[in-house]
Amino acid sequence: MARTDNDTWDINESVGATALGVAGGRAAETRSADPLISDPYAKLFLEAAGDGIWRVYLDDELPAELVGADPQFEDRMQAMLGYTACRTKFFDDYFLAAAGEGIRQIVILAAGLDSRAWRLAWPAGCVVYEIDQPKVLEFKIGTLKSHAVDPIASHVSVGIDLRLDWPKALAQAGFDASAPTAWSAEGLLPYLTADAQGLLFDRIQSLSAPGSRVAVEAFTNEFFSPESFARREEQTERYRQAAIRLGGKDITESGNLLYEEERTEVVDWLQAHGWTVTAATSAEDLMAASNRAVPAGLDAAVPESVFVEGRLR
């Protein structure tokens, strides 16, 4: 289903379904022999979402139909699981470091099925604001409540599309723009138009007190190139056909969800707006540092991304 300016989604459709795939990666990492992260709640979301391609993450072995669709499928799957684990660890470490330095106001943009408010060891007094589509947040909170899981930090759900007036909704939920904030944008930017991405950062800027921090999964202009889009779609179509043979399960065509538009590099934007960029680590370097390097010869296995941290002067 192609995107529209005012589209919405539930957890098992469109952009919402991608959150289940990411939760699947965290669930697989959590039960691995030497996990980088621990997310005991990711599995609960997969089970609660019903039947769908995301349920392959609940099994230790991949279906033969998917493996047969691509001789490199298992290696690609492991690379993406490694990417998800390293990305999760990056943001986990960022938030705990910010809280350790005294920041008590956290805003997770496009929170999806992230469960950091429930699983990280937050210091007393931390408030975690989560912004996402209302149905996505309702599914997450309802699932956790049904398993008697309570948040460790004070948790505030802000159900609103990031293309709408979320700063107003955030303020109405209790956000204090005069206090330093730790912001995150994880797995978000390609789902926004270039203009919407610019507006997102303008709004972060307007709400950030000095001393605020931001962490971003930024994507290079190579990621947004027609060649990269075509390559990803060719791979996805092969997997989609295999998933259908697996039993009618479907894989969303990523090209229908992402916006193929070049945009201002995040590092450049931050530096031009008074932020000190304290880290800008490529996905390859991030993964290699955690012994999750992509095997040589495995092309386009993970997104062309850079993990960026900044502090507002």
UniProtKB/Swiss-Prot annotation:
Pfam families documented for this protein: LCM (PF04072)
Gene Ontology molecular functions: methyltransferase activity
Transmembrane segments: none
Keyword Thylakoid: no
Gene3D superfamilies given in the database record: Vaccinia Virus protein VP39
Binding site for S-adenosyl-L-methionine: D132, D161, L162
GO biological process: methylation
Keyword Transferase: yes
UniProt-listed Enzyme Commission number(s): 2.1.1.-
Keyword line: Methyltransferase, S-adenosyl-L-methionine, Transferase
Superkingdom of the organism of origin: Bacteria
Described function: Exhibits S-adenosyl-L-methionine-dependent methyltransferase activity.
Family: Belongs to the UPF0677 family.
Name of the molecule in the record: Putative S-adenosyl-L-methionine-dependent methyltransferase MAV_2576
Organism: Mycobacterium avium (strain 104)
Lineage: Bacteria, Bacillati, Actinomycetota, Actinomycetes, Mycobacteriales
